[in-house]
Design a protein with these regions (language model features):
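Polybasic/polar functional segments that serve as interface/processing modules
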Residues: 1-138
């Protein structure tokens, strides 16, 4: 493991959002959130590569879903424990787009669609850390 004090640059950022009280009044939460993620990606003018949602019925995994939108710069995902009202979102980009913009758009849509939704944590982490100035593209 290296000493982080030597790392000066990064080539990507990862935004994490953690919510409670995620209980939108929709029939299929997984389909709804996947549509919300895809719309947010499009509004931020990020290129979508693939999208998928897997709904968990509680038999092998706790009830909820995992949704992913692969983008040309990495991904945007959502994971939900529906019985607990927990929702985790992450947006990771390693190109010209700012994942904070994606997170802001997603957050606004979630708040508009989910009464009592509460953001518990928002964290931004630099990714692809390096100390080679010649490799920095940001």
């Amino acid at each position: 493991m290296t000493d982080d004090s030597d790392v000066r640059l990064s080539h990507g950022r990862h935004v994490y959002l953690d919510y409670i009280n995620f209980n939108p009044e929709v029939e299929d939460m997984g389909t709804w959130i996947l549509s919300l993620l895809r719309t947010s990606v499009k509004e931020c003018e990020v290129k979508e590569v693939h999208a998928h949602c897997e709904v968990f019925d509680g038999v092998e995994s706790p009830p909820g879903f995992a949704a992913v939108v692969l983008i040309d710069e990495s991904h945007v995902t959502a994971h939900c424990y529906s019985e607990r009202g927990w929702l985790a979102i992450d947006a990771f980009t390693c190109g010209t787009h700012d994942p904070n913009d994606l997170a802001d758009v997603i957050h606004a849509k979630l708040v508009a669609g989910c009464e009592n939704l509460k953001l518990m944590n928002r964290n931004v982490v630099k990714r692809f850390l390096h100390d080679d100035i010649s490799q920095n593209k940001e």
